[in-house]
Swiss-Prot record:
Xref: InterPro entries: LCN-type_CS_alpha_beta_dom, Scorpion_toxin-like, Scorpion_toxin-like_sf, Scorpion_toxinL, Scorpion_toxinL/defensin
Assigned keywords, A-Z: Disulfide bond, Ion channel impairing toxin, Neurotoxin, Secreted, Signal, Toxin, Voltage-gated sodium channel impairing toxin
Family of this protein: Belongs to the long (4 C-C) scorpion toxin superfamily. Sodium channel inhibitor family. Alpha subfamily.
Organism: Buthus occitanus tunetanus (Common European scorpion)
One cellular-component annotation, GO: extracellular region
Signal is among the record's keywords: yes
Domain of life: Eukaryota
Protein name as annotated: Alpha-insect toxin Bot14
Signal sequence segment: 1-18
Length: 85
């Protein structure tokens, strides 16, 4: 009975979307560099499906765009790896 109630309660809800927070990456684990006074990161992050973004500091990469709720299909900087163009 309880499984019927759960499946009924789930009807009409949006499909589950996997997201995470992180520094959005260009190819080769490179950062999108930014200026703290610019809204460029918020725009970049939203264009890639995140809810928001801002300019932060990523150790080893410098200033970089950080995104909130970025879809899993969009790459983020891998910790411990340098940009290798």
């Amino acid at each position: 009975m309880s499984s019927l109630m759960i499946s009924t309660a789930m009807k009409g809800k949006a499909p589950y979307r996997q997201v995470r927070d992180g520094y959005i990456a260009q190819p080769h684990n490179c950062a999108y560099h930014c200026l703290k006074i610019s809204s460029g990161c918020d725009t970049l992050c939203k264009e890639n499906g995140a809810t928001s973004g801002h300019c932060g500091h990523k150790s080893g990469h410098g200033s970089a765009c950080w995104c909130k709720d970025l879809p899993d299909k969009v790459g983020i900087i891998v910790h411990g790896e340098k940009c290798h163009r």
